Amino acid sequence: MDRITTRVATAAAAVGLALLAAGCSGNNATAAGTNTTPVSAASRALPSPFTITTRYTAASLGLDHPDALAIGPDGNLYVTDDSQRVTVISPAGTVLRHWGKPGSGPGEFRFIAFEPTTPTDVAGKIAVGPGGKVYVSDSGNARVQAFTPRGHFVRQFGSFGSGRGQFLRPFDLAVDNAGNVYVADDQAENVSKFSPSGKVIWQIGGASSAPDLVGHHHFTMIDAHGRIVMVNDDLQKVVYVYSSGHEVDAFSPSFPTSSTIAGACEATVDAVGNTYVSGCGLQPTGPTLVFDRAHRLIAKWPGTPYSLLRSPAFGPDGEVFALATDGTILKLHITLPGA
């Protein structure tokens, strides 16, 4: 049984248990006081706040199935794809530059799929810091590489192993305003914080951690409050963690599961605190749910005509872009209820 198929079953079981618990107790808070009450209306009809204003196909940009997308402080899009390189694209869809090739040297990448049966589920994530430095999760080489915005190699950190500062399979990563880098290791099931120079500051995960921090985690950003916004897809929870490594909030989105959707997998937060949750899918279908700051479900992308591979990314000047499962880059306009 492959990784995603296993998570379909795990997610369905987790959601079922959460709903049962919600029916038996009026207060589902954790010991840390976090909100874990499931939103049972996740499958109801809701307005879609998303309008596609522009779309760029992978072929038109010269990309070989994009894996991840980040927006830099310059407003440009930084995209990794299966050709083992980074491509920089202007908001107007002009390819500005690219760098990288297959290999293990500086500036070379080996993005690998989690399972042979899920070739598009590739660990090749990317993040851009406030100063424009670009960080790439080089999963097959068990390291993170840092570059200037023009693609010049700066440094790398990490090596293969299970020790402190090492990786088994580095996956998601994010950068805070101070330049610290947060890396989720999908195989080791932990999250590590590194200084701007690549020194380990802390590591969370494992049996000794708080329950919400045990398992597989996915994240793409630091929100306006400096919190790492993560999804524990084993427990089907969105978890918010401060830069100190301590959990400060959580909720269960009750993401719909099916034979093609393995529950919640990705989350991002906009400038006013709304959380956008997308799923791990076997097929190019599935919704994206939108929750307000009180974790109330307020809107939903229905999953058609595009299903989002990652939750929307928010640019410095209000731009919103998202990566669809077929590799199309979508520019979105979002109008939420009551806005």
Describe each model-derived feature in a short phrase:
Residues 1-12:
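Bacterial N-terminal signal peptides that target proteins for export
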Residues 10, 34-37:
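Ala/Thr-enriched low-complexity intrinsically disordered regions
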Residues 25-27:
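Bacterial signal peptide processing site
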